Amino acid sequence: LLFLFIGFYLMMVMRWSIASPDKPLPGFLAAFLNEAWLSEEGRVTGDLYNMFGAMHGTIMVFLGIVPLAFGAFGNFVTPLQIGAPDMAFPRLNMASYWSYLLGGIVMFASFFIPSGAAEAGWTMYSPIATTAQLDEPNLWYTGQTFWLLGMVLLITSSLLGAVNFITTIINLRCRGMTWMRLPFFVWAMLVTGFLLLLAFPPLEVAAIMQLMDRLAGASFFIPTGLNFTGAGSVDAGLLDVSGAGSPL
């Protein structure tokens, strides 16, 4: 619920900037922001709007809707509807929620790093996620790096929960609870769990590969001849490390 409130606040800031682009943010919205993020007149800049768009999307999806609707509500309702005493793996459940909490803290901390939060969109578009904030002296202490680390932890949390739901629904149904008698909500949780197992591993691996590009000198997502723009210059030139252009 806390992260849902944070996502709602970011949405309100973006909606204000769209409705009144020539007016400064009112006090109740600007009170929680770093003054350096706003323009001299107190208005929302284009860079801040893009940054908040990335924050809002990730927070509402990975830190709000999925944990609340799929994780918390599903953990309570699914065992009741199939006649199970509990989820199949209670410790796996706790590991999922601890990973979620740690990922949320890491991602929330990235908002307050001096370099700013992620600049590559809420799904970490490549190669922007690899080249963003490369002009910072310490690449470990950048919002984009923290964002990638937080995404890895949050995706791990979702995968652990998906395995738990699938195992619970398949193995812990009470006697007489055939597949055709499963409640619609349980079917929805089962299908969602399989979709998570199909969709999230490539996204998590891509985040790890982008971290390797940023921190270990790899070139999974850096095409040959890639130019990038650095702070204070129109064109920072070619990257020192470049690969064949495709991780596949």
Where are these regions (language model features)?
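Membrane-embedded and interfacial regions of multi-pass energy-transducing membrane proteins
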Residues: 1-248
